[in-house]
Amino acid sequence: MERCSVAQQFEDRFHRKFYYLRLSVTDVCNFKCTYCLPDGYQPSGQKNSSFLNLSEIRRVVKAFADCGTSKVRITGGEPSLRKDFTDIIHTVASTQGIKRVATTTNGYRMEKHIGEWKEAGLNQINVSVDSLDPRMFHQITGENKFHQVMSGIDRAFEVGFEQVKVNVVLMKDLNHNELPAFLHWIKHRPIQLRFIELMQTGEMDTLFQQHHVSGVAIRNHLIANGWLLKVKAANDGPAQVFVHPDYQGEIGLIMPYEKDFCASCNRLRVSAKGKLHLCLFGDRGVELRDLLQQDDQESDLIARIQSELQTKSVSHFLNEGQTGMTPHLASIGG
């Protein structure tokens, strides 16, 4: 079976190299976040067995690893709802060439299971905490689980995680004024806060118009108060990360509406049903699943991905109001 050579590393026509795979393993979620699934998860009518199985996951991750991908983020939906989630982590972590295995979770199962996830090979975790006010957290997520999630973060440090990343979706009139509370929280904790601008998707146009707020004000505040921009690694995400000598924690800003946001794009997405998505806001998904059934299909799988990469756009078109085919962020893993 042919591996990619260095010259065949996944690369698009704009010479962007792809070191980072976001792999969704389910679109099911048990939270009802206002910016994602405000009415809760609505089953498609298909059985959950239609999601990628362990063998398919192993094959797609190996193909990406053989073509230069070194980081995999396991996403959802809520990925920990998969009964075989720990096995998925182990499968990804056991793949030659994969150096970092991450997941994004709502945190509700962390306190109980984070130890086994770490033992299986998980070495980076992102937890969604959209407010430090338990009542606002409940309002945004639809679940009264604030203290449970916070206990999960504490437990992550107890089992040996050196840093936990915390995602906060910025929303005007809901949580955009909580910066002082968040700064106080991370002063003596190795937490990287990641403020994410609300993004427009097919089903969330009204919410976007009501609650979108730019991260520029936060960035200006940080710079004015002595925070410094940190240099990125090749497989890091799109966050602008700021550090301060008086803070153990860090602040990241993800601002997709900013000019040149896509210039350093380094990630591709595979959905829980086995479709390749070149962009979170692309207008189509490319079927890969038919090439995930046998180990000897890897060269054909790689060829299909390489071919599709040449159609990847230079940028999304969010500023023109084009949100692509993504109905909500849970559908292809955010």
Swiss-Prot record:
Cofactor: [4Fe-4S] cluster
Keyword GTP-binding set for record: yes
Cofactor binding summary note: Binds 2 [4Fe-4S] clusters. Binds 1 [4Fe-4S] cluster coordinated with 3 cysteines and an exchangeable S-adenosyl-L-methionine and 1 [4Fe-4S] cluster coordinated with 3 cysteines and the GTP-derived substrate.
Single annotated GO MF: 4 iron, 4 sulfur cluster binding
PROSITE patterns: RADICAL_SAM
Catalytic reactions of this protein: GTP + AH2 + S-adenosyl-L-methionine = (8S)-3',8-cyclo-7,8-dihydroguanosine 5'-triphosphate + 5'-deoxyadenosine + L-methionine + A + H(+)
InterPro entries: Aldolase_TIM (IPR013785), Elp3/MiaA/NifB-like_rSAM (IPR006638), MoaA (IPR013483), MoaA_twitch (IPR010505), MoCo_biosynth_MoaA/MoaC (IPR050105), rSAM (IPR007197)
Keyword set includes Metal-binding: yes
Residue ranges annotated for the Radical SAM core domain, each copy included: 13-239
Record: residues binding S-adenosyl-L-methionine: Y35, G77, S128, M199
Residues given in the record as [4Fe-4S] cluster 1 binding sites: C29, C33, C36
Pathway: Cofactor biosynthesis; molybdopterin biosynthesis
Function in brief: Catalyzes the cyclization of GTP to (8S)-3',8-cyclo-7,8-dihydroguanosine 5'-triphosphate.
PANTHER family hit by this protein: GTP 3',8-CYCLASE (PTHR22960:SF28), MOLYBDOPTERIN COFACTOR SYNTHESIS PROTEIN A (PTHR22960)
Family the entry assigns: Belongs to the radical SAM superfamily. MoaA family.
Record protein name field: GTP 3',8-cyclase
Species of origin: Vibrio vulnificus (strain CMCP6)
